[in-house]
Amino acid sequence: MTIQNRIDPASSLPLEELLNTLPGGFNAIEDIKERRNVINSLIRMMTAELPPIDNIVIEDRNIAAPDALLELVVRIYKPTRISGSHPGILFIHGGGMIMGSIETENHKAAMLCETIQSIVVSVEYRLAPENPHPAQVQDCYEALVWMSKNAAELGFDTDRLAIVGGSAGGGLAIATALMARDQEFPKLSFQMANYPMIDDRNETPSSKEITDVGIWDRKANIEAWDWYLGGKNADEYAAPARAKDLSGLPPTFIDVGELDLFRDEDIEFAKRLLQAGVTTELHVYPGAYHASESFAPEAELSKQIWTKRIEALKRALNTNNNVL
């Protein structure tokens, strides 16, 4: 049975439409700037069809960056109904370390703010190849430190601080959590990594199996890692799968699709977290490809994926709002 035949039927149609419009998918676009433009346009069209997120306030702010010559842009999301203390979430967008922005995942961050009733900060980290590692994780860690130090002004409880990201954002969430552990600040109460990009070696069976889905596959992943590392060897902050010691990380939620090339590295990482004594919840979704819940939001599988995520965040952050 081919990979395409194993895709959840309701999640397959949007993928087929994408490949009809763009043969070969995103990976067929050689120029990185053109690829970014195409993906940004597609995401704008996709999010325009989603229901609006109400009852939140959004503010962009510049903060000091690790490089004193630069500033980081963070986008702050606050519920309009402020009552008591709220949890805090640092949200890290995906895009293979080479694409994406706070704008491309604005709807996700806003949805988390409204649904969890959380203060959410999304960080506009620098992208490769223009800025190779460690720029990305440095920016994310700087945003996490800033967020924690400004908790009172932002309006969240530092004892309920989580980090959330998907794909490259999931890898950066884990890397940032590793850095926070090593620097002993700030203390994270939870990390959620959705199909995280964490292993530069591309040696797992799934990394060799998923080669032509069109969303994110082996060729795209190898190319992105090459750009991200910029010719240097990967350390644990670049590729968390290389970390030898996973103890001391916060309770963790990982999910990944059966047909995602990150499947095996994510399953192995979850196993190692458990062996290191880290409370870990793992979900592997049959029929799901990389980011399928974003491309097919109306599919029942996508709704199931989001329900599990929201439930986990509410449990971890001790909130009592309705799931969706």
Q: Whereabouts are the PLM-identified features?
A:
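Proline/glycine-enriched tight loop/beta-turn segments at coil->beta junctions
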Residues: L69-L72, P79-G88, S247-L249
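Short amphipathic alpha-helix adjacent to the substrate-entry channel of hydrolases
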Residues: E103-S122
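Short beta-strand/loop motif that positions the catalytic acidic residue
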Residues: I254-V256
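Catalytic active-site module of serine/aspartate enzymes centered on a nucleophile-bearing elbow/loop
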Residues: A299-L324
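A glycine/proline-hinged amphipathic helix-loop "lid/cap" segment
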Residues: M1-I76, N318-L324
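Alpha/beta-hydrolase active-site loop
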Residues: N131-E153, R309
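Gly/Ser-rich "nucleophile elbow"/oxyanion-hole loop immediately N-terminal to the catalytic nucleophile
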Residues: S148-I163, Q183
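Hydrolase active-site cap/lid region
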Residues: L178-N233
